[in-house]
Amino acid sequence: VDRHDNSPPNGRTVSKEEMEKDVQLMKSLNINAVRTSHYPNNPYFYDLCDRYGIYVLSEANVECHGLMALSNEPSWVKAFTERSENMVRRYKNHPSIVMWSLGNESGNGINFKSAAEAVKKLDNTRPTHYEGNSSYCDVTSSMYPDVQWLESVGKERLQKSQNGETVKPHVVCEYAHAMGNAIGNFKEYWETYERYPALVGGFIWDWVDQSIKMPTPDGSDYYMAFGGDFGDTPNDGNFCTNGVIFSDRT
């Protein structure tokens, strides 16, 4: 599952107790892997994943949504590369980390190639991941593929491996968008994952609804507020409420 830091009373500041509650809930729901979308997490969260046995796809804090142009701008190569390097240096001794992600939805360019090479120099024991371009990474990746496309990828790589060719594993870093009454076709997705060895699984978008605890006008109760509840215009409405569980962890 993909996880953002969110605490209803404290926003992006998540307590140790809330982190542990998240990990315990993941275990109870048979979730075995978490992607730190889209930034490295508090060191204590990695400690918890080590302790409870949760695989981690640790993601660097690199994203330039929108134009996605910075990844091919040479003046930004140091910023891209150093963020991945800092992540690896800080967290490389956590056994829960099984893969490094160079960033999220930032287009494709020379800066990610530089980051991938830098990560390999620091740690050549773990595979690298970036959905925007897998040519310089150890796995290929996709977001929100349909089951038929995923089936075609698995079938093609199975045939190639049977012919003696080397194929990369495929990771679906976001799928089954959990907004409203969603996570459709989950059974079909997992039948496909289990049918083909090259399909190593995927990360549901996302773990928990992001909202802020707000008191009612008379102060007698509270509600979970999101876009538009703060007098903000324009806003994204309920687009941040797309978690597997509610923001109060129920």
Q: Predicted segment positions?
A:
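An acidic-aromatic substrate-binding cleft motif
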Residues: 1-33, 37-41
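Substrate-binding/catalytic cleft of secreted carbohydrate-active enzymes
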Residues: 23-26, 33-248
